[in-house]
Amino acid sequence: MRASPPAHSLLWLLVLLFAAPWASAQPAEPNAPPPPRNLIVLIPDGFGPTSQTMAREYLHEIEGRELVLDRILSGAVRTYASDSRVTDSAASATAYASGVKTYNGAIGLDATRAPVATILEAAEARGMATGLVATSRITHATPAAFAAHVPQRGMELDIAAQMLDQGIEVILGGGRPFFLPTDTNTDYAGRRDDGRDLVEEARERGYAVALDRAGFNAFSAIPLGGADTAPPVLGLFSDSHLAYEIDRDPSKEPSLAEMASFALAHLSTDPNGFFLMIEGSRIDHAGHGNDPVGHLHDIIAFDEAVAGALAFAEQDGETLIVVMADHETGGLSLGRNLDGRGIYDWRPDVLAQATRSVEGMLALVDEGMAPDTLMATRGGIVDLTDDERSALRDAVGVIRGPGSLYSVMAAILSERALIGWTTGGHTAVAVNLHSYGPHAERFAGVMQNDAIGRTLADVMGFDLDALTAELRAELRQEPETVVE
């Protein structure tokens, strides 16, 4: 059963206006294969080519298995934004979702701040089921770019409202407070000061809602049988981002692979096909923090979600999978020679000893554990040098910067593993492209990120230009919704 947004919803009007039969899509080239029935886009945020090498070699050497992503590696993506050679997630995800380059920070707008339709909106207009799954707040930049239109990515309260109005069938991630009012009577804090309770509004529209792990487990009882019988679902499992995979408490939060598997089972019952975006969000966050442990294990968790999607597509035969990061984060290198020691190597075995991310270890420091003890028991570094112990002691109480406890812990782990980082931000490095299924050959070689978006629309037969024109016309007719 599809959600029923209010009549005043601009984006719901788009669905009504542009709902059309399959035959109304853009005409195919003579003898071209039919469009895929289903489309799965997977985005490992902040995942560069070196990240893929790190995970590949770690899995091969430490766990004796291969990286699933390597099976479908097909090319590379240039990621620059309209206003910078180094993109952010908002601009790059907008390029993937809408086929246009835009400025850093933009969500669903072009470089002139005019709204542009997305492939999710096109899928909804066709009557397909749609889903968004992320380990970040679901209102964060990447998922937002597929379902909202705002001038700055930080407008997460607006993004949450627009996302709900889209009628998306599966929404799973973190970010509860952006859906709840500040005066909420629930056990969870809210950040909405407009009085709206989007969780309650979702229930009124027919959504099954989960705000914790128990609620997610209850989703398994939902009857599956197509859009007319299966209710849409909204799952918000954290106040902010979900935990890094290596820190995750399975009794409190589902994994990315679990959420992706549920989304596939739920959406695949729709007779009109589905669109699903899955983001491994926290790969990027660990890159920003130069945390090799968090980075590595979230890549592996993402690869498990890819494995599930690939198994589905292999059996289904009508599903296109496209995988690419929005950008690289951290300037990661495998091999480190900043101290003149001349060691040409890197050590995945060091990372294998760690059982917590740096963020996870800091949480235990807040509970009273000593940093040097944590580095031994959770970081796996049992032979700290005097210099390392001194750096840890000096960093206690330092919140930010190179001398913070986070930075010192991350640096010790990286140095021991002979891993280097060049930045705490993003880089301009081209990211790897992966594809499988019908029309996968069109996602190969070196492509621009906006070309990815246009090609996705083309192979699916979506007319984004027509939807964009209608979106802008509707905005002109409803001044209160104009993007400023």
Predicted features by range, described:
Residues S9-P21:
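Bacterial N-terminal signal peptides
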Residues A23-P30:
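Boundary at the C-terminal end of the N-terminal hydrophobic targeting segment
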Residues T130-V133:
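Short hydrophobic alpha-helical runs that function as membrane-insertion/retention elements
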Residues G108-A117, V150-G154:
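Glycine-rich anion/phosphate-binding loops
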Residues M1-P6:
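N-terminal secretory signal peptides that target proteins for export/translocation
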Residues P36-L39, F47-Q52, E57-T94, Y103, ...:
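A post-motif C-terminal structural segment
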